[in-house]
Swiss-Prot record:
GO cellular component: membrane
Annotated source species: Emericella nidulans (strain FGSC A4 / ATCC 38163 / CBS 112.46 / NRRL 194 / M139)
Protein family according to the UniProt entry: Belongs to the amino acid-polyamine-organocation (APC) superfamily. YAT (TC 2.A.3.10) family.
Superkingdom classification of source: Eukaryota
Disulfide linkage: none
Chain segments annotated as transmembrane: 48-68, 73-93, 127-147, 153-173, 184-204, 237-257, 278-298, 322-342, 379-399, 407-427, 458-478, 485-505
Record region (Disordered): 1-24
Name under which the protein is recorded: Proline-specific permease
Subcellular location: Membrane
Example GO biological process: amino acid transmembrane transport
UniProt topology in membrane: Multi-pass membrane protein
């Protein structure tokens, strides 16, 4: 029996727009009405967009906190585990997005479409808020990184400059954003590759002092720094803490490809390509980077501990810089600080893009004011960009010490919010697979990834436990504070309030029936768009190498 058509599918179900979620067909209609986004992102831009958002201050600086608290072994182990989780999250998003890379698509749109409207609503605002706060976080980091050079003007001026540049790159044509992010990300990749090579040189004693490090610091002071309690229990808690904290380095990076799907050329060719190559780069940069950090800096290094305790965000708190200084290499710390600045600036650029497209998608679904669907003549949803960028002004809170405390709350909330959304992505993917199986279409997927659905079960299990235990340390004797408890768990209240409020108001079902999950609307349009898409063949060896990389 042949699968039902999109028309017959819609005739046999209740339109989801009655719940305020917005039918996929409505999404397309609203976007067309206000000038659609343009497919202006190339394959090379899409690939570096994702990895560029992933390589941020978490890798260059955030690793210092994990190293000092837990030791080099938990740092490496946690990055391996988190990279495997990101691989599966990226794969399931790649499958769903390649199947339906429609205009205005976003991760919460897919979640709501394949689960039920209230989950999509809560997820959507969780995503938008998190992206906007991450923008503010990276802008703040940029200002503090510049402070490393002790400029004669206030950090507030640098924050303003960074914000204005990010707005300019996002409010004009998407090609501007894509090209700027391509070069930003390229510089970050060169920086991390250079630091990894430098680490290998220091490992074998190639520095100015010719001190062969080897695995010295894994023996003294040791591979593990017991956390909270001594012995093996403390070592395990160190690993678990490292796993929780490493989430900030990876969070939301898989979603960037889905966010850009509606604006990329030849989506069914370029999205799978970006998905496959993204994870290779993550494994290379993050795992090798964490290994280099662990062998070149001791977890009890006084300079590193001082940088972490001072709350620095620039080169002074970077384990890479500490390793360079210990090796007696002069001047290179300024180069690394410039690389960290580019990293933070680029990540802020990516989060502004992701937040604006998420808000744009919410408005197209009827979940946000219609004004956010407005686009300019180049296809950029400028109202959504301005709304997301405005949240970035919270970065000025860091001009006061009390503001830094409040801002610390916001940035921690985004990490937990990201964990919650990864669990929801898993649920949406399982529902997507069941709907395809129901209609006998599972083998018709244009892009299939290995180890599914078992990889999704693995992600949901690990991330659920991480989410529930992310604030476990506050329950140890003498460590409980109301602020730390709220930082760890208030995101649950926010998410549940959004979810329950929408469900009570619209009386949505607990889950859309598998037989009614819409896997058809928009598919015919994408099939027509991609049916004549033929990949160009390289004309010479230079093109062959270039296309192999990008």
């Amino acid at each position: 029996m042949s699968p039902p058509s999109a028309k017959s599918m819609e005739e046999g179900r209740t339109p989801s727009v009655q719940y305020g979620y917005g039918d996929p067909k409505t999404l397309e209609g609203e976007i067309e009405e206000h000038t659609a986004t343009k497919r202006g992102l190339s394959s090379r831009q899409l690939q570096l967009l994702a990895i560029g958002g992933c390589i941020g201050t978490g890798l260059f600086v955030g690793t210092s906190t994990v190293l000092t608290q837990t030791g080099p072994a938990p740092l490496l182990m946690s990055y391996i585990v988190m990279a495997s989780i990101v691989w599966f999250v990226m794969n399931v998003l790649g499958e769903m997005t390649t199947y339906l890379p429609i205009r205005g698509v976003s991760v919460p749109y897919l979640i709501g479409r394949f689960t039920e409207p209230s989950i999509g609503f809560a997820s959507g605002y969780n995503y938008w808020y998190s992206f906007a706060m991450l923008l503010a976080s990276e802008v703040t980091a940029s200002g503090l990184i510049i402070e490393y050079w002790n400029p004669p003007v206030s950090v507030g001026l640098w924050i303003a400059i960074v914000l204005v540049v990010i707005l300019a790159l996002n409010v004009f044509a998407v090609e501007w954003y894509g090209e700027s992010e391509f070069w930003f990300a390229g510089l970050k990749i060169l920086a991390i590759i250079g630091l990894i090579i430098l680490g290998v040189v220091l490992f074998f004693g190639g520095g100015p002092n010719h001190d062969r490090l080897g695995f010295r610091y894994w023996q003294d002071p040791g591979a593990f720094n017991p956390y909270l309690v001594p012995g093996d229990t403390g070592k395990f808690l160190g690993f678990w803490t490292a796993l929780i904290k490493s989430g900030f380095s990876f969070i939301f990076s898989p979603e960037l490809i889905t966010t850009a799907a509606g604006e990329v050329e030849a989506p069914r060719r370029n999205i799978p390509k970006a998905t496959k190559r993204f994870i290779y780069r993550v494994f290379t940069f993050y795992i090798l980077g964490s290994l280099v950090i662990g062998v070149t800096v001791a977890y009890n290094d006084p300079t590193l501990e001082a940088g972490v305790e001072s709350g620095g965000s620039g080169a002074g708190a970077s384990p890479f810089v500490v390793a360079i200084q210990n090796a007696g290499i002069g001047g290179l710390n300024h180069v690394v600080n410039a690389a960290i600045l580019i990293s933070a600036w680029s990540s802020g650029n990516a989060w502004c893009y992701a937040g604006s497209r998420t808000l744009y998608s919410l408005a197209g679904e009827g979940q946000a004011p219609k004004i956010f669907t407005r686009t300019n003549r180049t296809g950029v949803p400028y109202v959504a960009v301005l709304a997301t960028w405005t949240i970035g002004l919270l970065s000025f809170l860091n001009l006061s010490s009390s503001g830094q405390t409040v801002f610390y709350w916001f940035t921690n909330i985004t990490t937990v919010g990201g964990f919650i959304n990864w669990v929801l992505i898993g649920i949406a993917y399982l529902r997507f697979r069941k709907a395809l199986q129901f209609h006998g279409m599972l083998d018709m997927l244009p892009f299939k990834t290995p180890l599914q659905p078992y990889g999704t079960y693995y992600v949901m299990f690990i991330i659920s436990i991480l989410t529930l235990t992310n604030g476990y340390a506050v329950f140890f004797p003498g460590r409980f504070t109301a602020s730390d408890f709220l930082v760890s768990y208030i995101v649950f209240a926010i998410f549940l309030a959004l979810y329950a409020g929408h469900k009570i108001w619209y009386r949505t079902p607990w889950l859309t029936k598998v037989s009614e999950v819409d896997i058809f609307t928009g598919k015919d349009e994408i099939d027509r768009l991609c049916e004549n898409d033929m990949e160009r063949q390289p004309r010479n060896w230079l093109e062959r190498v270039w296309w192999w990389i990008f």
